[in-house]
């Protein structure tokens, strides 16, 4: 008897859904938060980003119902302020390790430069960092009321390209950095030509995987994001999540190998290895967990996508059935299977990478040396200024010495450090990375 009642209730529920989603509502009427859309070309409007509710002229609001309005604002603020700080941090590192400042390149500095160039481009996808700040919270992803931005919207396309290319570049060069640290410890060297070919291949892959979705018209704003990215599930898997999974696997292997090399070293060698590599190693591990969290979170969303759709459908059925009740907004409450805190961490982690980079690569002796030996500190104007400063703060004799010979602090410290050998004729070379 109980089973029969349960079956009857289920049948009645699905009959309600079928009735609600096939009925025609009065023109111009849609219960809040649904939005009325007078559509003359339904297919075209769907392609433009409107999400119609069944056969009605009601569309889902933008941003979507998956989170409350206050949750969406919190996500946006975290992205805006965290991204604004991080983008300037990554820009500083990009300039520092670029040919504009750094005139001595090796495998390691090239990896750092491309890594933070990718992070900078990814963060630049947050249009409100560069574009009009006077617009509303979500005007870039919701260009019209109830419409999710699509590739045909120029800002949406720009956001999608920047985010996709930046993420791909960042994660592939993060993997390269983990391999490079291990190769440095093992004294494995490769030629400049090999480095050049590798950089071309990696950047070509990033460009290829970025522009394939454009040909398939796949960039747009989704129910889960605060920007534009790839919409189709299989396009996401092929264009991003599969490459990320490969990068995470390679990165995990080489993190383990690095830790093993440090573990098996003894005495002074272990101390020197720890002192030399703890900063890049900690950064690599932090970014591994951040990329890994992004991977796990999106897997969770994909796994719960149908459940989310059912929750939204149930909520919409409720408000349509109870729209005649003035208290329907209190009767109908949407269930949210995706915790807002988990989504918040997803946005936060992707916008902390530039800040972390400055901590582990910006506040180092290597960064100081790069700037001190750069053109910007060794041109006629800067040398004249520094000479004047020394005159005002030194004795006449020290001033004459400064004018007659190159100051000791302008001698390339990296060259000096590269000549230092580890005592006891040990065979571990520590000269390529300096992060004291």
UniProtKB/Swiss-Prot annotation:
Transmembrane segments: 75-95, 110-130, 157-177, 195-215, 238-258, 282-302, 344-364
Localization: Membrane
Signal peptide annotation: 1-22
Membrane topology: Multi-pass membrane protein
Keywords from the named record: Glycoprotein, Membrane, Receptor, Signal, Transmembrane, Transmembrane helix
Domain of life: Eukaryota
Carbohydrate attachment residues: 38
Residue runs in coiled coils: none
InterPro entries, alphabetized: GPCR_Fz/Smo-like
Gene Ontology cellular-component annotations: membrane
Residue intervals annotated with topology Cytoplasmic: 96-109, 178-194, 259-281, 365-436
Parts of the chain on the Extracellular side: 23-74, 131-156, 216-237, 303-343
Similarity comment text for this entry: Belongs to the G-protein coupled receptor Fz/Smo family.
Protein name according to UniProt: Frizzled/smoothened-like sans CRD protein B
Organism: Dictyostelium discoideum (Social amoeba)
Lineage, top ranks: Eukaryota, Amoebozoa, Evosea, Eumycetozoa, Dictyostelia
């Amino acid at each position: 008897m109980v089973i029969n009642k349960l079956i009857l209730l289920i049948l009645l529920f699905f009959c309600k859904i079928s009735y609600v989603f096939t009925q025609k509502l009065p023109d111009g009427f849609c219960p809040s938060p649904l939005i009325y859309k007078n559509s003359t070309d339904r297919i075209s409007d769907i392609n433009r980003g409107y999400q119609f509710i069944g056969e009605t002229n009601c569309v889902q609001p933008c941003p979507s119902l998956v989170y409350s309005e206050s949750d969406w604002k919190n996500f946006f603020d975290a992205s805006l302020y965290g991204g604004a700080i991080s983008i300037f941090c990554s820009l500083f590192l990009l300039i520092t390790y670029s040919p504009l400042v750094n005139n001595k390149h090796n495998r390691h500095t090239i990896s750092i430069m491309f890594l933070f160039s990718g992070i900078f481009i990814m963060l630049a996808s947050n249009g409100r960092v560069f574009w009009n700040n006077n617009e509303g919270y979500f005007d870039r992803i919701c260009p019209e009321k109830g419409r999710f931005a699509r590739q045909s919207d120029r800002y949406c396309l720009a956001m999608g390209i920047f985010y996709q290319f930046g993420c791909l570049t960042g994660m592939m060069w993060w993997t390269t950095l983990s391999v490079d640290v291990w190769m440095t410890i093992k004294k494995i060297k490769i030629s400049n030509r090999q480095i050049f070919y590798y950089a071309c291949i990696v950047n070509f892959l990033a460009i290829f995987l970025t522009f394939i979705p454009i040909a398939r018209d796949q960039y747009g704003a989704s129910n889960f994001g605060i920007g534009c990215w790839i919409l189709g599930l299989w396009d996401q898997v092929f264009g991003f999540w599969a490459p990320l999974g490969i990068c995470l696997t390679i990165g995990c292997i080489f993190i383990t190998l690095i830790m093993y090399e440090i573990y098996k070293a003894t005495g002074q060698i272990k101390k020197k290895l720890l002192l030399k590599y703890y900063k890049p190693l900690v950064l690599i591990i932090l970014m591994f967990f951040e990329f890994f969290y992004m991977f796990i979170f999106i897997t969770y969303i994909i796994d719960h996508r149908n459940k989310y759709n059912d929750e939204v459908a149930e909520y919409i059925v409720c408000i349509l059935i109870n729209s005649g009740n003035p208290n329907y907004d209190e009767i109908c409450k949407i269930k949210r299977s995706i915790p807002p805190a988990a989504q918040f961490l997803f946005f936060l982690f992707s916008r902390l990478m530039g800040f972390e980079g400055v901590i582990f690569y910006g506040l180092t002796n290597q960064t100081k040396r790069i700037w001190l030996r750069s053109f910007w500190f060794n041109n006629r104007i800067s040398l004249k200024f520094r000479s004047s400063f020394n005159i005002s703060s030194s004795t006449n004799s020290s001033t004459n010495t400064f004018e007659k010979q190159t100051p000791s602090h302008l001698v390339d410290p990296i060259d000096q450090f590269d000549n230092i050998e580890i005592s006891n004729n040990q065979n571990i070379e520590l000269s390529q990375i300096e992060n004291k």
